[in-house]
């Protein structure tokens, strides 16, 4: 037996649900609720058919159940509608849809309600209050309350807008740096978005260089190198136009460091080359040295060995005329030799290795002399000049001995042993490996290796 319930009864129930702000709300019964109560709509008759298997036996019970269910479904919607204005203030979203605490616009007791710009006295008062907020936030973070800390900082950042872009940008950069080091990615994201908004607003204006510099630095603090570089390039164009040499050089230094730190060697080299030109024209010897060293580093890292040699030759001239820098001549000669070897200019490489060895030995830099000797031995072996390699290896042993480098002596004897093996001079090879074993036993390192070498040589001698 089926019981018929007028659909108008349920429709009337729907009409009783209202939102305080939106008026009437139409609420639909979800499918899972229809299945639960075995409800089926009949469009033709306008009736709902309810099976006898329902727990409720009377129309009154069914009405009560429907009212409860509909109210249960509609209540969250009603609450959502009635609080929509509050939520709009409390949880603003960015274009990407994430929560942006910097977009909250509700009034703040620290900010006067007047629409007029703040007077100088009001600005000083607000700035002092915001500095206190910054201190409170830092204390919260130190105490482990990161949520409370960033809540206070976000309030500070919102209020900083009343003090102008300069104050706001500096504060954004400061908090952004803290958030980045604290791994607060969402906080960094909203701060970066605000910096981009400010950048867009000042593009059409002839903003001060001070503001642009602050903006560029803030982009650095939130790890946005491309934005920072673009900002500094804008500054550079203006300083060049104004023929402000000091400001141009300062901006070039910033750009050079930025490009270098983000591994853009091409742009960094161009920046340092321009700085070198300025320093050379001004006769600034110390700055010239600094920029040449930076260029040398860049060319080494980018494996531009021809440019590296050219820069090192300029450094060589400076080192030779400065007694304090002359101690670095052996290492510079050694580096030049390696560059020439990488360029397959072996004769030039050999000459620089020889000069590196001679100057290092004269300055009693025996470890460095040993490095130069190893490079010479490598060249001799590559050219098949085994006798020269052996003679140089004997000097290498002495250099390592003077440097008190037991490990270096051990590897030198190993090298000598290998050279004698190449010439099938097994008795000399055996002597070299035995000396190497003695040193290995002192170090307790590679003892097995030398023992195996000795065993193999003895086997060949016994054949």
Language-model features, listed with the residues they occupy:
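N-terminal leader/linker segments that initiate helical-solenoid repeat arrays
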Residues: 2-36, 43, 51, 71, ...
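Short coil/turn linkers that connect adjacent helices within long alpha-helical scaffolds
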Residues: 122-124, 143, 161-165, 182, ...
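Residue signature of alpha-solenoid helical repeat architecture, marking inter-repeat boundaries
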Residues: 127-128, 147, 166, 206, ...
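Residue register of alpha-helical TPR repeats
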Residues: 131, 170, 210, 250, ...
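Amphipathic alpha-helical segments of tetratricopeptide repeats
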Residues: 157-158, 196-198, 234-238, 274-278, ...
């Amino acid at each position: 037996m089926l019981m018929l319930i007028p659909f108008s009864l349920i429709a009337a129930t729907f009409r009783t649900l209202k939102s305080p702000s939106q008026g009437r709300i139409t609420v639909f019964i979800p499918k899972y609720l229809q299945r639960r109560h075995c409800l089926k709509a009949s469009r033709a008759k306008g009736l709902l058919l309810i099976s006898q298997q329902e727990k409720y036996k009377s129309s009154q019970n069914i009405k009560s159940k429907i009212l409860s269910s509909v109210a249960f479904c509609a209540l969250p919607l009603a609450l959502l509608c009635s609080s929509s204005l509050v939520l709009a203030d409390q949880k603003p979203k960015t274009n990407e849809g994430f929560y942006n605490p910097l977009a909250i616009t509700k009034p703040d007791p620290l900010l006067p309600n007047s629409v007029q710009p703040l007077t100088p006295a009001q600005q000083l008062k607000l700035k002092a209050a915001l500095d206190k907020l910054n201190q409170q936030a830092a204390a919260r973070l130190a105490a482990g309350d990161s949520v409370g800390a960033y809540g206070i900082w976000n309030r500070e950042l919102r209020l900083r807008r009343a003090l102008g872009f300069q104050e706001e940008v500096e504060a954004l950069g400061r908090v952004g740096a803290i958030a980045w080091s604290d791994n607060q990615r969402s906080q960094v994201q909203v701060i970066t978005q605000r910096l981009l908004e400010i950048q867009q607003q000042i593009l059409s204006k002839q903003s001060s260089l001070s503001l642009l510099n602050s903006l560029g630095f803030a982009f650095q603090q939130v790890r946005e190198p491309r934005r920072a570089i673009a900002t500094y390039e804008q500054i550079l164009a203006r300083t060049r136009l104004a023929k402000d040499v000091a400001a141009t050089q300062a901006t070039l230094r910033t750009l050079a460091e930025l490009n270098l730190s983000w591994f853009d060697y091409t742009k960094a080299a161009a920046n340092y080359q321009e700085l070198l030109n300025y320093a050379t024209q001004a006769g600034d010897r110390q700055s010239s040295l600094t920029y040449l060293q930076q260029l040398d580093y860049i060319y080494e890292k980018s494996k531009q060995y021809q440019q590296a040699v050219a820069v090192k030759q300029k450094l060589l001239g400076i080192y030779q005329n400065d007694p304090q820098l002359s101690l670095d001549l052996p290492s510079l000669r050694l580096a030049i030799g390696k560059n020439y070897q990488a360029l397959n200019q072996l004769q030039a490489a050999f000459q620089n290795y020889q000069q590196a060895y001679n100057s290092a030995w004269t300055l009693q830099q025996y470890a460095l002399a040993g490095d130069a000797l190893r490079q010479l031995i490598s060249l001799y072996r590559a050219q098949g000049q085994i006798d020269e390699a052996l003679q140089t290896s004997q000097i290498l042993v002495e250099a390592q001995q003077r440097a008190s480098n037991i490990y270096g002596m051990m590897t030198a004897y190993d090298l000598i042993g290998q050279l004698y093996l190449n010439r099938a001079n097994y008795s000399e090879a055996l002597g070299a490996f035995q000396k190497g074993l003695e040193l290995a036993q002192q170090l307790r390192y590679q003892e097995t290796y030398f023992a195996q070498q000795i065993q193999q040589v003895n086997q060949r001698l016994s054949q």
